[in-house]
C-alpha cells in the first residue's frame, strides 16, 4: 500500500478542472473495452488536474509512477509518413525496437518484451451496454471457456486498433491496465516466449503465494514490472491523458473487472482495475503534449510491493475532456505495453 511521506510538492503549472468518471458499480459491461469506457455506474467528480510543466523532469517512474521523456522516433520522419504509424511491418521492425531501447535506458532492465500495441484515432464514444448486473468475480466472468490455442500461434506482441473496423478512442474511465492477480496470470499464460523467460519468476511467485501474506510479502525472485507508453501522433489539443501520483492512491481504490484473454493453456483470468473515488488523489497532466514527448506509466512493479519500499507502483489514469476543445482535431496516439525484467 502506498505510504511514502515525502511527497513532491506540486510544481507551478496550469491547473484545470476535469470531470472524472470514478467507478461506483456494480455493473457487468459487455466487453473489456466497455468495462473501461462505460460511464454507467460511475460517480462524476470535478477534480483539479495539475500541469507538470515547467517541472516535467521532477516526475519519474520510480518516484511517482509516471514520467514524460523526450524521444524522437524514426517513424516521424521521411521516408515514413503519417500512415506508417499504423503499418504493422513498420511498427514491428522500427517502432517496437525503439521502445525496447528506450525502456531499457530508462529503467535499467536487462530484458524488455512488448506485449500489446494499440492505436487510438477516433473520438470518444460510450459503448452500448447490457442492463446492470453485479460485478463479475473470478469464477463468474461470463466468458465461455475456449480451447487452448497452440503456443506457436500466440505471439508475445499482440496488436489492436490498427485495422479498419477495430478503431478505438480515448478511455474516459480511470483504471489500471492490470491488477496484481491478472499481472501474474498474464506472466504464466500470455505466450510461450514469456513463460520461458519468466520460469524462475513464476516458481518464486508460486512459493511466495503459499506463505502467510502471499506474494506481496514474500516474493524473493527477480524484479519485474509492467509499463505502458503513450505517444501522441500530433500535438494534443483535446482528450489529454491524466494520471494519479502513486503515493496519493490506496490499494483499495481499484476494483477488479475480470476478463478472459486467450493464453497458451486456454483462456485465463486477467483483470482491469477500475478506479474508485478517493479525495487524496492528486491528478496530473502535461499540456500540449507533442509527438516527441512520450508518456510512460507503471502498471505494476514487484519492487514497489515490498514492505517499506519507496519505489512507486502502478498508477490510475484516463483521458479527460477539456472544455472548449470539441472542434479540435481528433486525438491520435500509439500505446505500447511492455514487461521489463531485471
From Swiss-Prot:
Pathway where it operates: Plant hormone biosynthesis; gibberellin biosynthesis
Example of a GO MF term: oxidoreductase activity
Any one biological process term the GO annotation gives: gibberellin biosynthetic process
EC number: 1.3.-.-
Enzyme class: oxidoreductase
Disordered as annotated region, ranges: 127-183
Disruption phenotype: Impairs the production of GA3 and of its immediate precursor GA7, but accumulates GA4 and GA1.
Keywords for this protein: Oxidoreductase
Record-linked InterPro entries: AsaB-like
Family from the record: Belongs to the asaB hydroxylase/desaturase family.
NCBIfam families linked: CmcJ_NvfI_EfuI (NF041278)
Function (record text): GA4 desaturase; part of the gene cluster that mediates the biosynthesis of gibberellins (GAs), diterpenoids that may provide a selective advantage during infection of the preferred host plant, rice. Gibberellins (GAs) are diterpenoids and are synthesized via the mevalonate pathway. Biosynthesis of the major metabolite GA3 (gibberellic acid) from geranylgeranyl diphosphate (GGPP) requires 13 steps.
Name of the featured protein: Gibberellin cluster GA4 desaturase
Species for this entry: Gibberella fujikuroi (strain CBS 195.34 / IMI 58289 / NRRL A-6831) (Bakanae and foot rot disease fungus)
Taxonomic classification: Eukaryota, Fungi, Dikarya, Ascomycota, Pezizomycotina
Amino acid at each position: 500500500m502506498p505510504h511514502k511521506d515525502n511527497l513532491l510538492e506540486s510544481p507551478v503549472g496550469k491547473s484545470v478542472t476535469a470531470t472524472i468518471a470514478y467507478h461506483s458499480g456494480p455493473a457487468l459491461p459487455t466487453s473489456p473495452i466497455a468495462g473501461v469506457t462505460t460511464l454507467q455506474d460511475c460517480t462524476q467528480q470535478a477534480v483539479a488536474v495539475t500541469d507538470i510543466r515547467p517541472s516535467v523532469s521532477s516526475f519519474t517512474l520510480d518516484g511517482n509512477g509516471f514520467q514524460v521523456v523526450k524521444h524522437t522516433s524514426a517513424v516521424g520522419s521521411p521516408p515514413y509518413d503519417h500512415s506508417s504509424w499504423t503499418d504493422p511491418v513498420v511498427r514491428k521492425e522500427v517502432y517496437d525496437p525503439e521502445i525496447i531501447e528506450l525502456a531499457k535506458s530508462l529503467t535499467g532492465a536487462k530484458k524488455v518484451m512488448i506485449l500489446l500495441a494499440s492505436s487510438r484515432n477516433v473520438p470518444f464514444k460510450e459503448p452500448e451496454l447490457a442492463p446492470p448486473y453485479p460485478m463479475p468475480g473470478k469464477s463468474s466472468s461470463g466468458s465461455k471457456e475456449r480451447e487452448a490455442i497452440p503456443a506457436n500461434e500466440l505471439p508475445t506482441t499482440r496488436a489492436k486498433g490498427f485495422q479498419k473496423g477495430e478503431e478505438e478512442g480515448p478511455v474516459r474511465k480511470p483504471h489500471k491496465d492490470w491488477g496484481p492477480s491478472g499481472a501474474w496470470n498474464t506472466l504464466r499464460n500470455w505466450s510461450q516466449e514469456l513463460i520461458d523467460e519468466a520460469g524462475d519468476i513464476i516458481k518464486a511467485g508460486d512459493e511466495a503465494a503459499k506463505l502467510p501474506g502471499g506474494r506481496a510479502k514474500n516474493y524473493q525472485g527477480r524484479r519485474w514490472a509492467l509499463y505502458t507508453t503513450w505517444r501522441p501522433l500530433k500535438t494534443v489539443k483535446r482528450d489529454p491523458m491524466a494520471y494519479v501520483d502513486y503515493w496519493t492512491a490506496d490499494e483499495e481504490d481499484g476494483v477488479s473487472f475480470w476478463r478472459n484473454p486467450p493464453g497458451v493453456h486456454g483462456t485465463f483470468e486477467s483483470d482491469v482495475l477500475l478506479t474508485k473515488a478517493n479525495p487524496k488523489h492528486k491528478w496530473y497532466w502535461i499540456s500540449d503534449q507533442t509527438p516527441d514527448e512520450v508518456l510512460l506509466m507503471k502498471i505494476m512493479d514487484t519492487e514497489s510491493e515490498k514492505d517499506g519500499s519507496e519505489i512507486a507502483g502502478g498508477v490510475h489514469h484516463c483521458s479527460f475532456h477539456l472544455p472548449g476543445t470539441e472542434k479540435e482535431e481528433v486525438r491520435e496516439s500509439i500505446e505500447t505495453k511492455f514487461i521489463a525484467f531485471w
